[in-house]
């Protein structure tokens, strides 16, 4: 039998429908792969008993012809999504052994459609990071290595566990979240596909909040088709989330293979940053050539406020985080460190519970929201955000269907290599991705090539609001031209 963990999600779905194997066999193969790959530290909690029970129930539904769209397909869930009765910590000490009494809307919809829970995936603490090194469970290791080197590389962040697990064959797909690039950057670093949908497309209910006006859930998968299949189940209106948009969810898979002839693709001149590596520039041109060969028209566009996006993002996001994280005080749930009085208990709990990067962002956020600096920083950043959104609106109003950019300024870097002395060095990883969150737009990262050391590189496509279909059609053109990217297994 084929190695079941090497199948795409679509292939596994079709194999189950043909009864080539059972959901239990598929799940057991993934559980064995997870056990053999613990060195990657992708999972922070494995749920084998629950997975097998869900797989058996899926096999019964398949047998009686009542299969859902994801019936029997084993997935990993980022540890930011509440899973009822299954420990959810946001990879922070402050949540301790917290076991949610409810299920996040996104994961509930996956289970409704028949998916199987393999376990909870590692992420940067409270999703704050670009390398998955801030998790209280330790860093995630990228399954990719530089040619001729055994140095451990980061998988990107904050959804590093999701990206690493998908790339290494430890699940058929995974949930992830994206606040400033946390789906697209890890996807680019691991040779996987990641889509951040339009803000409001997927419910945020039951997802641990980082920055509420920027956070959005989405899938990481091995192929564009797989991402389309997963997003259809994850998306949809939810009355429990006031920012959820009540729009019908299209059949995203139907966009795969659709012609892109005549589409206008914007190439933004502002994304040609100083010091951009030649191989990223060459990859960008290659991607544009592939889309042109498929019948798309390339046009240069201007997004003049791009240069202000990163500083504005690192004001807005920490400001919202400082407010959201005020709820973690040790009183009603999570870890508690006692003190002589309640104020001391708050202080002790937060001092011991939060990691260094989370504390840094809470401090930045509290500072920019303080009376003396609110107008100078926070208010100004929100005005910049409006201008960034307007840049995109003007671009799309000229008939541009999507915008093509690099996904990251480099390939994956080594664990411990960046951001030690200067956090800004790490923040610069988000330079191509934050504009999408600031404007609330959909963006997809698709693997498009390798660097000189054999590491995957990704391209990003940015779409009009709620036009994820077009991103899937264009993304598949790049995927077909570039081919699939699979790391050489060194860990088992």
Swiss-Prot record:
Mind listing the UniProt keywords for this protein, alphabetically? ATP-binding, Ligase, Nucleotide-binding, Protein biosynthesis
Record-annotated active site: 78, 158, 182
In its keyword annotation, does this UniProt entry include Cell inner membrane?
Answer: no
List its EC numbers: 6.3.5.7
Q: How is this protein annotated for GO cellular component?
A: glutamyl-tRNA(Gln) amidotransferase complex
| Catalysed conversion reaction | L-glutamyl-tRNA(Gln) + L-glutamine + ATP + H2O = L-glutaminyl-tRNA(Gln) + L-glutamate + ADP + phosphate + H(+)
Listed Pfam families: Amidase
One term of GO molecular function = glutaminyl-tRNA synthase (glutamine-hydrolyzing) activity
Biological process (GO) annotations held by this record are: translation
Q: Return the InterPro entries for the record.
A: Amidase (IPR000120), Amidase_CS (IPR020556), Amidase_dom (IPR023631), AS_sf (IPR036928), GatA (IPR004412)
Q: Identify the enzyme class.
A: ligase
From which domain of life does this come? Answer: Bacteria
Xref: SUPFAM superfamilies:
Amidase signature (AS) enzymes
Q: Which family does it belong to?
A: Belongs to the amidase family. GatA subfamily.
Q: Which NCBIfam families match?
A: gatA (TIGR00132)
Summarizing the function annotation, the protein's role is: Allows the formation of correctly charged Gln-tRNA(Gln) through the transamidation of misacylated Glu-tRNA(Gln) in organisms which lack glutaminyl-tRNA synthetase. The reaction takes place in the presence of glutamine and ATP through an activated gamma-phospho-Glu-tRNA(Gln).
**Subunit details for this protein?**
Heterotrimer of A, B and C subunits.
User: What PANTHER family has UniProt attached to this entry?
Assistant: GLUTAMYL-TRNA(GLN) AMIDOTRANSFERASE SUBUNIT A, TRANSAMIDASE
In its UniProt entry, what is this protein called? Glutamyl-tRNA(Gln) amidotransferase subunit A
């Amino acid at each position: 039998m084929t190695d079941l963990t090497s199948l795409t999600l679509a292939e596994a779905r079709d194999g189950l429908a043909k009864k080539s194997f059972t959901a239990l066999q598929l799940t057991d193969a993934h559980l064995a792969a997870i056990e053999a790959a613990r060195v990657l530290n992708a999972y922070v909690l494995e749920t084998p008993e629950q997975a097998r029970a869900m797989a058996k129930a899926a096999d019964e539904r398949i047998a009686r012809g009542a299969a859902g769209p994801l019936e029997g397909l084993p997935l990993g869930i980022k540890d930011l999504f509440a899973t009822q009765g299954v420990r959810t910590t946001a990879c922070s000490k402050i949540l301790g052994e917290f076991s949610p009494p409810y299920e996040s809307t996104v994961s509930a919809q996956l289970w409704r459609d028949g998916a199987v829970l393999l376990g909870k995936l590692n992420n940067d603490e409270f999703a704050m990071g670009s390398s998955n090194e801030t998790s209280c469970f330790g860093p995630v290791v990228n399954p990719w290595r530089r040619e001729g080197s055994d140095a451990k590389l980061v998988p990107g962040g904050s959804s590093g566990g999701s990206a690493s697990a998908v790339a290494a064959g430890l699940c058929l797909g995974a949930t992830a979240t994206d606040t400033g690039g946390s789906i697209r950057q890890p996807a680019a670093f691991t040779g996987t596909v990641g889509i951040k949908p339009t803000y409001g497309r997927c419910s945020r209910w039951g997802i641990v909040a980082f920055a509420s006006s920027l956070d959005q859930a989405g899938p990481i998968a091995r192929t564009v088709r797989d991402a389309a299949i997963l997003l259809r189940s994850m998306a949809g209106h939810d009355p429990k989330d006031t920012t959820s948009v009540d729009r019908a969810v299209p059949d995203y898979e139907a966009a795969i293979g659709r012609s892109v002839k005549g589409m206008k693709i914007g190439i933004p001149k502002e994304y040609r940053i100083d010091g951009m590596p030649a191989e990223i520039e060459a990859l960008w041109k290659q991607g544009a050539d592939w889309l042109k060969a498929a019948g798309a028209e390339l046009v240069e566009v201007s997004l003049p406020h791009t240069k202000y996006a990163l500083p504005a993002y690192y004001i807005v996001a920490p400001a919202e985080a400082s407010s959201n994280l005020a709820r973690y005080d040790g009183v009603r749930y999570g870890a508690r460190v006692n003190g002589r009085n309640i104020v001391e208990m708050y202080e002790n709990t937060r001092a011991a519970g939060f990691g260094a990067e989370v504390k840094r962002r809470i401090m930045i956020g509290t500072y920019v929201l303080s009376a003396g600096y609110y107008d100078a920083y926070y208010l100004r950043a929100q005005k910049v955000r409006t201008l960034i959104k307007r840049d995109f609106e003007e671009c799309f109003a000229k008939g541009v269907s999507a915008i093509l950019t690099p996904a990251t300024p480099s390939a994956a870097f080594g664990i411990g290599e960046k951001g030690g002395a200067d956090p800004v060095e790490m923040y610069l990883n988000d330079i191509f991705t934050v504009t999408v969150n600031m404007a609330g737009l959909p963006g997809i990262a698709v693997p498009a090539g390798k660097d000189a050391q054999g590491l995957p590189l990704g391209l990003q496509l940015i779409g009009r609001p709620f036009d994820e279909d077009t991103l899937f059609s264009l993304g598949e053109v790049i995927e077909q031209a570039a081919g699939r990217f699979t790391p050489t297994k060194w860990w088992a």
